[in-house]
């Protein structure tokens, strides 16, 4: 359980550091600007960040990638219609288990709220799912949808693992 918290905190830290990267002033040499003014954008490889975080769980809590667009659309209706730079989703091998990780980098800041709403709808619907009542506490009490710049992350922890207050406050 502690490994899961560490995984989520590591993923959130990577995203927060990426959001801190901003525009840099154009480099100057001999008092003149070189080239066009470019914005240096920092980005996070969400797939690698998620895989690194999931690796810390070991065999205790396996999560597998969801890569099929139709499956993504079935789980998160409307998500595939949003223009994204990156999207990774991980689920356990057993349906209904209260443990998921979704990380999205949207192409436009205007889409952040749309993605946040889609992921929050997933949390809300699973929290009220009568098909898997044993997992309801995880969705009600141990889930978070966070936004940091153009990144939106949804994490759900198994029952018995609580989100640290610092984690909730940061995201």
Q: Predicted segment positions?
A:
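Second-shell loop/turn segments in exported
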Residues: 100-108, 151-155
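A short, solvent-exposed beta-edge/loop patch
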Residues: 94, 135-171
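Short Gly/Thr-rich strand-loop-strand
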Residues: 109-149
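C-terminal motif of bacterial Sec signal peptides marking the signal peptidase cleavage site
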Residues: 15-19
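N-terminal, intrinsically disordered, polar/charged segments of Gram-positive cell-envelope systems
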Residues: 6, 21-74
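Positively charged n-region of N-terminal signal peptides that target proteins for export
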Residues: 1-4
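Extracytoplasmic/secreted envelope proteins and their assembly/folding machinery
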Residues: 47-54, 112, 116-120, 164, ...
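Short, compositionally biased low-complexity segments enriched in polar/charged residues
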Residues: 63-98, 110-111
């Amino acid at each position: 359980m502690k490994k899961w918290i560490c995984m989520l905190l590591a993923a959130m830290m990577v995203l927060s550091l990426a959001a801190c990267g901003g525009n840099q002033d154009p480099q100057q040499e001999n008092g003149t600007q070189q080239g066009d003014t470019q914005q240096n954008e920092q980005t996070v490889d969400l797939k690698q960040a998620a895989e690194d975080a999931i690796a810390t769980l070991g065999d205790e809590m396996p999560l597998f990638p969801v890569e099929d667009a139709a499956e993504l659309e079935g789980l998160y209706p409307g998500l595939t219609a949003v223009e994204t730079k990156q999207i990774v989703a991980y689920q356990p091998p057993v349906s209904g288990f209260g443990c998921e990780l979704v990380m999205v980098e949207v192409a436009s800041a205007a889409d952040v709220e749309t993605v946040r709403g889609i992921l929050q709808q997933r949390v809300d619907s699973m929290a009220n799912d009568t098909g898997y009542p044993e997992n309801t506490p995880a969705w009600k009490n141990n889930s978070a949808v966070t936004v940091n710049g153009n990144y939106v992350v949804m994490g759900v922890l198994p029952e018995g693992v609580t989100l640290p207050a610092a984690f909730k406050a940061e995201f």
